[in-house]
Swiss-Prot record:
Coiled-coil annotated spans: none
Binding-site residues, Zn(2+): 210-211, 214, 226
Lineage: Eukaryota, Fungi, Dikarya, Ascomycota, Saccharomycotina
Designated name of the protein: Ubiquinone biosynthesis protein COQ4, mitochondrial
Annotated function: Lyase that catalyzes the C1-decarboxylation of 4-hydroxy-3-methoxy-5-(all-trans-hexaprenyl)benzoic acid into 2-methoxy-6-(all-trans-hexaprenyl)phenol during ubiquinone biosynthesis.
Gene (name only): COQ4
Length: 335
């Protein structure tokens, strides 16, 4: 038996060696062919681009120029040349697509601010922005804002200074609101899809002032608070997206939330928006040291019921009712 096993092992040995002898030369030929033909292919490409036999040509510069030509060719497919930093010109059909997609996403995913940003610009029609421009031109503060074009950032507002202001000032109220809601004026998205530079700035100004509206009305950034402020903006400024939000956004809320909005906050927002001064004309940066109560009176803004308090009271009431129900259920359940 031992002899038979040795014979079998020695019989298979040449076959394995033969296979290994075939595989190794094939692998070597493949590697050598790749080097030769790959090099020839690269040489052919370089010859086609004219990068051989001329040591005086800056090939890196030529490659950069070719890239620039491709970018220009792509830019020529746009509806116009960009008119300001960050401008993305769109054709009409692209604007319609932007409106449809952002509108759909905003309705089903309102928690994603990017959808709201896109919908805002998609619905910011030139006629609306021109009307807002005329509103600003008719007011001395509005004209100054258009002329100076301030940019609202934490650096400009000096947040450390706001934290030390008297507690009755609007600046301190604004600072505390930012801190409580954990937001910053630096997080506002830039305007990209509005073509006219002045219109783009006006919409940027509207967007950057949004948090001031929250702070002066003591409205949180939860969904009910956002809908309320959008309704205020729609009534006061005629912002199309804000009007749409005030009408459609409540449809996806819980019954108790819709009831609060329809009975309390939306009527307040519409009434206040129609009666107060155009908020786009307020130079908020210059109002930070004013008494907040006096500023509200000057702007004809009345405070709504505290939304945070109402939500807490309802949560406490629901917790109390649940506790009573569970207690009664345990009492009536036989041991």
């Amino acid at each position: 038996m031992l002899r038979l096993s040795l014979l079998r092992s020695t019989a298979t040995l040449p076959v394995k060696c033969q296979r290994r002898g075939l595989i190794l030369p094939a692998a070597a030929m493949y590697t050598l062919g790749s080097l030769i033909f790959g090099k020839e292919a690269r040489l052919a490409d370089a010859m086609e681009r004219g990068e051989l036999h001329n040591k005086n040509v800056d090939y890196a510069k030529e490659a950069e120029e070719r890239t620039e030509l491709r970018i220009r060719a792509l830019a020529n497919t746009r509806s116009m040349e960009p008119r300001y930093n960050g401008h993305v010109p769109l054709h009409r059909y692209e604007k319609l697509l932007l409106f449809a997609i952002s509108g759909w996403n905003s309705f089903f995913h309102p928690e994603d601010g990017y959808n709201i940003v896109q919908l805002g610009e998609a619905t910011a029609l030139p006629v609306f922005l021109e009307n807002l421009k005329q509103t600003m031109l008719s007011d001395s503060s509005g004209r100054r804002i258009l002329k100076e074009q301030p940019n609202i950032t934490t650096e400009i507002l000096h947040m450390d200074k706001l934290a030390k202001l008297p507690h009755n000032t609007f600046g301190y109220v604004y600072y505390q609101w930012l801190k409580r809601e954990n937001v910053s004026p630096d997080t506002r998205a830039p305007v990209k899809f509005i073509d006219d530079p002045m219109h783009a700035y006006i919409f940027k100004r509207y967007r950057q002032c949004h948090d001031f509206y929250h702070a002066i009305t003591n409205m949180p950034i939860i969904i009910e608070g956002e809908i309320t402020i959008k309704a205020l903006e729609g009534a006061n400024l005629g912002v199309p997206m804000a009007i749409l939000g005030g009408i459609l956004a409540p449809l996806r809320l819980k019954k108790v939330q819709r009831k609060r909005l329809y009975n309390i906050y939306l009527p307040w927002a519409v009434r206040t928006g129609l009666s107060c001064k155009p908020l786009i004309n307020v130079y908020w940066e210059e109002m930070l040291e004013k008494d907040v109560t006096a500023l509200r009176k000057e702007l004809k803004i009345t405070l709504p019921p505290d939304l945070r308090t109402m939500r807490k009271e309802r949560a406490a009431l629901r917790k109390e009712i649940d506790a009573k129900y569970n207690s009664q259920k345990r009492a009536t359940t036989p041991a």
